[in-house]
Protein backbone atom coordinates (compact mmCIF):
# COMPACT_ATOMS: atom_id res chain seq x y z
CA UNK A 1 0.00 0.00 0.00
CA UNK A 2 1.39 3.40 -0.95
CA UNK A 3 0.80 6.74 0.78
CA UNK A 4 -1.64 7.92 -1.90
CA UNK A 5 -3.74 4.79 -1.37
CA UNK A 6 -3.71 5.29 2.41
CA UNK A 7 -4.77 8.94 1.94
CA UNK A 8 -7.59 7.86 -0.37
CA UNK A 9 -8.83 5.24 2.09
CA UNK A 10 -8.65 7.74 4.97
CA UNK A 11 -10.74 10.22 3.00
CA UNK A 12 -13.27 7.41 2.48
CA UNK A 13 -13.47 6.79 6.24
CA UNK A 14 -10.68 4.30 6.97
CA UNK A 15 -10.04 4.06 10.73
CA UNK A 16 -8.03 0.84 11.23
CA UNK A 17 -5.39 -1.11 9.35
CA UNK A 18 -4.75 -4.61 10.67
CA UNK A 19 -1.56 -5.88 9.06
CA UNK A 20 -1.56 -9.48 7.88
CA UNK A 21 1.28 -11.92 7.36
CA UNK A 22 3.46 -9.33 5.67
CA UNK A 23 3.77 -5.63 6.27
CA UNK A 24 1.30 -4.10 3.78
CA UNK A 25 3.17 -0.85 3.15
CA UNK A 26 5.33 -0.17 0.09
CA UNK A 27 8.43 0.52 2.20
CA UNK A 28 11.94 -0.90 1.91
CA UNK A 29 12.11 -1.00 5.68
CA UNK A 30 10.61 -4.03 7.37
CA UNK A 31 9.42 -2.19 10.47
CA UNK A 32 7.93 1.28 10.43
CA UNK A 33 9.19 2.69 7.16
CA UNK A 34 7.92 6.06 5.92
CA UNK A 35 4.63 4.69 4.58
CA UNK A 36 3.90 2.69 7.71
CA UNK A 37 4.84 5.67 9.85
CA UNK A 38 2.53 7.94 7.85
CA UNK A 39 -0.39 5.54 8.27
CA UNK A 40 0.41 4.99 11.97
CA UNK A 41 0.20 8.74 12.56
CA UNK A 42 -3.18 9.00 10.79
CA UNK A 43 -5.17 5.87 11.74
CA UNK A 44 -4.99 2.89 14.09
CA UNK A 45 -2.43 0.47 12.62
CA UNK A 46 -2.22 -2.91 14.34
CA UNK A 47 1.23 -4.30 13.49
CA UNK A 48 1.61 -7.70 11.86
CA UNK A 49 3.42 -9.19 14.85
CA UNK A 50 0.24 -8.68 16.90
CA UNK A 51 -2.47 -9.04 14.24
CA UNK A 52 -0.94 -12.15 12.73
CA UNK A 53 0.38 -13.94 15.81
CA UNK A 54 -2.23 -16.69 15.51
CA UNK A 55 -0.25 -19.60 14.09
CA UNK A 56 2.81 -18.99 16.26
CA UNK A 57 0.56 -18.83 19.29
CA UNK A 58 -1.26 -22.03 18.27
CA UNK A 59 2.07 -23.87 18.00
CA UNK A 60 3.07 -22.59 21.44
CA UNK A 61 -0.29 -23.62 22.88
CA UNK A 62 -0.07 -27.13 21.40
CA UNK A 63 3.37 -27.66 22.91
CA UNK A 64 1.82 -27.65 26.40
CA UNK A 65 0.88 -30.87 28.17
CA UNK A 66 -2.61 -31.74 29.38
CA UNK A 67 -4.50 -29.03 27.54
CA UNK A 68 -7.84 -29.20 25.78
CA UNK A 69 -7.33 -29.39 22.04
CA UNK A 70 -10.56 -27.85 20.83
CA UNK A 71 -11.34 -25.00 18.48
CA UNK A 72 -12.73 -23.01 21.39
CA UNK A 73 -9.68 -23.49 23.64
CA UNK A 74 -7.21 -22.64 20.88
CA UNK A 75 -9.21 -19.59 19.76
CA UNK A 76 -9.51 -18.39 23.36
CA UNK A 77 -5.74 -18.66 23.84
CA UNK A 78 -4.95 -16.75 20.63
CA UNK A 79 -7.59 -14.10 21.39
CA UNK A 80 -6.18 -13.68 24.88
CA UNK A 81 -2.66 -13.21 23.50
CA UNK A 82 -3.80 -10.52 21.05
CA UNK A 83 -5.97 -8.83 23.67
CA UNK A 84 -3.14 -8.77 26.21
CA UNK A 85 -0.71 -7.33 23.65
CA UNK A 86 -3.13 -4.55 22.69
CA UNK A 87 -3.91 -3.82 26.35
CA UNK A 88 -0.18 -3.49 27.02
CA UNK A 89 0.13 -1.03 24.13
CA UNK A 90 -2.91 0.90 25.39
CA UNK A 91 -1.36 1.29 28.86
CA UNK A 92 1.62 3.04 27.28
CA UNK A 93 -0.31 4.85 24.54
CA UNK A 94 -4.09 5.26 24.95
CA UNK A 95 -4.30 7.15 21.65
CA UNK A 96 -5.88 5.74 18.49
CA UNK A 97 -2.69 6.53 16.58
CA UNK A 98 0.95 5.45 16.88
CA UNK A 99 -0.11 1.95 17.92
CA UNK A 100 2.51 0.28 15.71
CA UNK A 101 5.29 2.54 16.95
CA UNK A 102 4.35 1.89 20.58
CA UNK A 103 4.02 -1.88 20.04
CA UNK A 104 7.41 -2.02 18.32
CA UNK A 105 9.05 -0.06 21.15
CA UNK A 106 7.54 -2.44 23.72
CA UNK A 107 8.68 -5.50 21.72
CA UNK A 108 12.23 -4.17 21.36
CA UNK A 109 12.45 -3.41 25.08
CA UNK A 110 11.33 -6.98 25.85
CA UNK A 111 13.91 -8.42 23.46
CA UNK A 112 16.69 -6.37 25.04
CA UNK A 113 15.91 -7.59 28.57
Feature annotation, model-predicted:
Residues 13-113:
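Adenosine-phosphate binding glycine-rich loop
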Residues 1-4, 11, 19:
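Rossmann-like NAD(P)-binding element
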Residues 2-6, 26-27:
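Cysteine protease catalytic core and zymogen-processing segment of caspase-like enzymes
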Amino acid sequence: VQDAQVKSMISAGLEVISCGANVPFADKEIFLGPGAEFADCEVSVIPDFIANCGMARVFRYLMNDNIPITDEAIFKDVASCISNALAEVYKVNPSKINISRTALEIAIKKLLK
